[in-house]
């Protein structure tokens, strides 16, 4: 199996700095784009992830960077052959560890107090694919031309219903003073089929474009830069980051 991956992350039209970041294998992407093709064998592992630092917290750009770099190291250092349940347990242990680390950093350096970030990821480990989510960044699957959101937003809007195009308070994150962080993890191996496309994105995309618009762009073979540019043209009220993973 081969993965064709394209990622991009930009500040948008309103924010002063980009607090988003994308991780493709061992490469972090911010204010840039990056493409890679990865051949997977049974013994390989691969991680793509996206983090959206808390815009209302000092150090959001540090939070997203710290979490992705720490996860990249942790994932690469995991022992081979863990069962699905042991893999899930290891990720939960990592979540608790990184939360403690960010809390300690916030106490020792006041400028980072309550910094936090979302996280969404697609991982290949021990011949299985897993997606994971904490916050309101999203993972979608495009199958036979139809786009479906796999993750559930951990947000107030999702809890109470309704929508607001520009504001969506999250109810779960890594750091950010959240004492009860949790992470959704799903074994999605049976959903990973040749021709499918997986999309990781921050809310800077989904607040500017609806699912129908995103579906149309993906069916037109748009890359990560194209999706980011469309969000910026629509107003670019937030940082916008996209990672597209095509199953070849």
Predicted regions and their residues:
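PP2C/PPM-type serine/threonine phosphatase catalytic domain
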Residues: 1-248
């Amino acid at each position: 199996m081969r993965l064709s991956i394209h990622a991009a992350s930009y500040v948008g039209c309103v924010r002063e700095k980009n607090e988003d970041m994308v991780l493709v294998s061992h490469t972090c992407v911010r204010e840039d784009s990056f493409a890679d093709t990865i051949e997977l064998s049974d013994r390989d592992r691969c991680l793509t992830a996206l983090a959206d630092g808390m815009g209302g917290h000092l150090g959001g750009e540090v939070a997203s960077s710290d979490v992705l770099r720490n996860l990249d190291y942790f994932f690469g250092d995991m022992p081979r052959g863990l069962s699905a349940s042991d893999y899930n347990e290891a990720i939960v242990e990592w979540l608790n560890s990184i939360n403690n680390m960010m809390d300690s950093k916030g106490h020792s350096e006041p400028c980072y107090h309550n910094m936090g970030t979302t996280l969404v990821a697609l991982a290949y480990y021990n011949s299985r694919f897993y997606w994971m989510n904490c916050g309101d960044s999203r993972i979608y699957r495009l199958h036979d031309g139809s786009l479906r959101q796999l993750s559930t937003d951990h947000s107030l809007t999702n809890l109470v219903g309704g929508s607001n195009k520009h504001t969506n308070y999250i109810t779960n994150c890594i750091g950010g003073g959240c004492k009860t962080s949790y992470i959704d993890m799903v074994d999605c191996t049976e959903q990973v089929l040749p021709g499918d496309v997986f999309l990781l994105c921050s809310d800077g995309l989904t607040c500017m474009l609806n699912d129908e618009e995103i579906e149309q762009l993906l069916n037109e073979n748009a890359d990560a830069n194209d999706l980011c540019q469309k969000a910026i043209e629509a107003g670019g009220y937030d940082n916008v980051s996209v990672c597209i993973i095509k199953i070849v």
